[in-house]
Amino acid sequence: MLKHADNETLTRTGPGTPLGGVLRAYWQPAALVSELSAERPVKAVRLLGEDLVLFKRPDGGWGLVSRFCAHRGVDLSFARLEARGLRCLYHGWLYDAAGQCLEQPAEPEHSRFFEKVRISGYPCAERNGIVFAYLGAGDPPPFPAYDCFTAPKEYTFAFKGLWECNWLQGLEGGIDPSHVSFLHRFLDADPREAYGQQFSEEVEGTGTKLSQLVGDHYRPDIEVEAAPHGLRVYAVRQLTASVKHVRVTNLLFPNAFVVPFGNAKVFTQWHVPVDDEHHYWYMIYYDFAEPTDSETLLRQRLAGVSLPDYQPLRNRANNWGFDPREQHELTYTGMGLDINVHDQWAVESMGPIQDRTAERLGVSDRAVTANRRLLLSAADAYQTGGKLPARPLDQAAASGLTGPLAVDTIAPSESWRQHWRDREAERRRCSPWSGSEWSGSQWSGHAPGRGTGA
């Protein structure tokens, strides 16, 4: 359990809060590129409790500014998009991508008043289908060389979804390796097609889908280690006397996780506060072996949401589609075949902000407790001007933040620690875009242990 004050620290992310300051010190997803129309690429965005407007400039760059005009407070998401920025409809004030006012047409011709007027403006950068924004102080850090950023676009796919709960609930679900044995279990054979469906591929060398394997072996040995990107999490299941199943996942500090999607596929997923009671998850899926079938992936995911807000069709208002008969005959949850809905139910059912003073954590929660300690330490460091984890200060440091390694594999019991790394190295050697020249901090690390967990 947490102290009430610590829970408040971890869940409050608006302007001026310690954890909000931590999140603002990193690049955060602001929108999917596909959300902005070619005809008028302007979109209202609420991010970390701030109301903003995202727009694409004629030169291809991006601007992110306060949603409200400094003059009389009207909504700039309806502004005219011009070559130099956004022009307010009310009195014609023009703002550039940095939020600086450039023109005030109704003021006297000789007036320089516009030079004194500025609204909030934040740097933006586009990476593999997502527009990222930096809301922190000073210059933004360089982007790390993580796989999700360096993979060629044709090998990636990006999407998002709205969850009606605090951001930390979503993130903690993603770094909890034991829930998959229950929440995502099928009572009989998994009926889903493999492509694009998490846990539906066969685990290489077993002939068994991952959903069945983790369901049959529901008591993994969980180990957590510190890593340059945050945390590395091992869930090791004993299949036979001589063979283990090894699943390696990651916390990408401060608010993302990286998990294997199949034998050649991985995804990185951020949990980004809209405000303290709502957040979006953003995903970049990438394939080491072949270009993605983006049309299929998009069709699968659009079938479960309503636009333009990416609100899941299964939600609290309809009990997440709960079907008692299905729960008896097909799925552990009774909430359909989409694993993302299962995760959504788990974290939304806790309420808008989970009361962590009332929870009881066990050994299987090692990754959750390690992450909370890391976040609280970072909040303290932010307030005292200390160093934040996994935040590169220069390009050399950013280039050293690679991977992270995320893999599902079977391994000899005695040598699993080395075997999974060999398996990952082979996957990269065979990859068209992450070949044998790949190297980085991910190959080194502390031996997995339990000291950072519960």
Where in this protein do the model-derived segments appear?
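Short, charge-rich amphipathic segments
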Residues: 2-4, 18, 101-113, 298-313
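Short beta-strand or tight-loop elements
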Residues: 26-28, 48-50, 120, 229, ...
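C-terminal catalytic domain of Rieske-type non-heme iron oxygenases
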Residues: 15, 61, 132, 138-438, ...
